[in-house]
Amino acid sequence: MTPTPGEADLTNTPAPRARRSVLSRGSWSETARIAGILRKETVGGAVLLVASAVALVWANSPWAESYFALRDLKIGAEPFGLHLNLTLGTWAADGLLAVFFLVVGLELKREFVAGDLRDPARAALPMAAAVGGMVVPALIFVAVTAPVGDGATRGWAIPTATDIAFAVAVLAVISTHLPAALRTFLLTLAVVDDLLAVTVIAVFYTDEINLTALGLSIVPLALFALCVQRRIRSWWLLLPLGVATWVLVHESGVHATVAGVLLGFTVPVLRSVAAGGPEAGPGLAEHFEHRLRPLSAGVAVPVFAFFAAGVAIGGVSGLTRALSDPITLGIILGLVVGKPVGIFLTTRVLTAVTRANLDDALRWIDVFGVALLAGIGFTVSLLIGDLAYGLGSDRDDFVKVGVLTGSLVAALIAAVLLRVRNRHYRAVWLQETADTDRDGVPDVYQSQRD
């Protein structure tokens, strides 16, 4: 039928394209993997909190001198001129945290090769949000501390980190059923945060570089890579190569935790064709991650926190002095205001620019609640504080007060926001876990089963 004048011909008009949803539910395999990681991190977070509390109580008790004497006790030697006669606090920061960053390297590579970050469309949002969550708190810290001078701005990266173990411990305490999409977003944010943190540590907190030691570190690193590419799992071979890499990176002047990330990056994520291909089971990276994550979350990070979190507050007057210092204020404002605002605004702007919609199961208040959880910066924040101002210095003490206070305030506000929404989260959780045919895959994931 020919349309009359003034009438639009709708027969050939294309249907409007549906808008893409952001923070939508991912695949079942990825959701299940992330749930397993967060369960382990919850236990690690509890141990982390206990270790930090013990350190704080001990450092402010009549036996405080014994705590600081233990932290500053030197153990080691200097064979072949290598500087390995370190304090226990330094061994924890440089040595044990290398295990933590090894797991970070494994996780990063898996995310980029087989996880959500392999898809540019899904990776763009958390990566941009992580950058926003780094830039805004850094700017706030610099604005607050710049008038002080005397190198106060050197700690600009302190309020930019996220402690996933601390964050999921908060979720466990408030018993919230966070939807899978938000859990994935939080973990991916933390993973990208760790990548940015390693880059910042290597670039901005390295004063002098011993090029000879750095060049020599390539030899054991390459041998380690050769072994894992050939799927050699023998720890009697891999461990000495890993330790040798760590020693030489430490000697080079680059922070030794970078060695952990580099070692993690060498481990293959997918099985080779000769080993049966991806369908034959998880790759070596996932195998190592399962083995090392309990050591990282349950031992390495809590021991570091024990030696790093102890600060002699000095009563009410000392706490007042610390809280009024620009470094402390810059960290608190960076974590509580800068971090969530940076993540939230970046997410909101990117969603608007790409003409996408937030997933139907979520509201923007949910995104802000997760952004507040990302404001819990602990492990990496304390490490950067040590690097920026020196372990045991007055400014390092202000860093500890700022990180502890800022993380606590961010956790409390996030807990209130997320707890208010918990009834809705529970309804989403029931939908995401319903498995009427009892085949092990929840019904909502049946169409994307992989």
Swiss-Prot record:
<feature type="transmembrane region" description="Helical">
    <location>
        <begin position="258"/>
        <end position="278"/>
    </location>
</feature>
<feature type="transmembrane region" description="Helical">
    <location>
        <begin position="364"/>
        <end position="384"/>
    </location>
</feature>
<feature type="transmembrane region" description="Helical">
    <location>
        <begin position="43"/>
        <end position="63"/>
    </location>
</feature>
<keyword id="KW-0406">Ion transport</keyword>
<keyword id="KW-0472">Membrane</keyword>
<feature type="transmembrane region" description="Helical">
    <location>
        <begin position="299"/>
        <end position="319"/>
    </location>
</feature>
<dbReference type="GO" id="GO:0006885">
    <property type="term" value="P:regulation of pH"/>
</dbReference>
<keyword id="KW-0915">Sodium</keyword>
<keyword id="KW-1133">Transmembrane helix</keyword>
<feature type="transmembrane region" description="Helical">
    <location>
        <begin position="234"/>
        <end position="254"/>
    </location>
</feature>
<feature type="transmembrane region" description="Helical">
    <location>
        <begin position="155"/>
        <end position="175"/>
    </location>
</feature>
<keyword id="KW-0812">Transmembrane</keyword>
<keyword id="KW-0050">Antiport</keyword>
<dbReference type="GO" id="GO:0005886">
    <property type="term" value="C:plasma membrane"/>
</dbReference>
<dbReference type="InterPro" id="IPR023171">
    <property type="entry name" value="Na/H_antiporter_dom_sf"/>
</dbReference>
<keyword id="KW-0739">Sodium transport</keyword>
<feature type="transmembrane region" description="Helical">
    <location>
        <begin position="185"/>
        <end position="205"/>
    </location>
</feature>
<dbReference type="GO" id="GO:0015385">
    <property type="term" value="F:sodium:proton antiporter activity"/>
</dbReference>
<comment type="similarity">
    <text>Belongs to the NhaA Na(+)/H(+) (TC 2.A.33) antiporter family.</text>
</comment>
<feature type="transmembrane region" description="Helical">
    <location>
        <begin position="326"/>
        <end position="346"/>
    </location>
</feature>
<feature type="transmembrane region" description="Helical">
    <location>
        <begin position="398"/>
        <end position="418"/>
    </location>
</feature>
<protein>
    <recommendedName>
        <fullName>Na(+)/H(+) antiporter NhaA 2</fullName>
    </recommendedName>
</protein>
<feature type="transmembrane region" description="Helical">
    <location>
        <begin position="124"/>
        <end position="144"/>
    </location>
</feature>
<feature type="transmembrane region" description="Helical">
    <location>
        <begin position="208"/>
        <end position="228"/>
    </location>
</feature>
<dbReference type="Pfam" id="PF06965">
    <property type="entry name" value="Na_H_antiport_1"/>
</dbReference>
<keyword id="KW-1003">Cell membrane</keyword>
<dbReference type="InterPro" id="IPR004670">
    <property type="entry name" value="NhaA"/>
</dbReference>
<keyword id="KW-0813">Transport</keyword>
<feature type="transmembrane region" description="Helical">
    <location>
        <begin position="86"/>
        <end position="106"/>
    </location>
</feature>
<comment type="function">
    <text>Na(+)/H(+) antiporter that extrudes sodium in exchange for external protons.</text>
</comment>
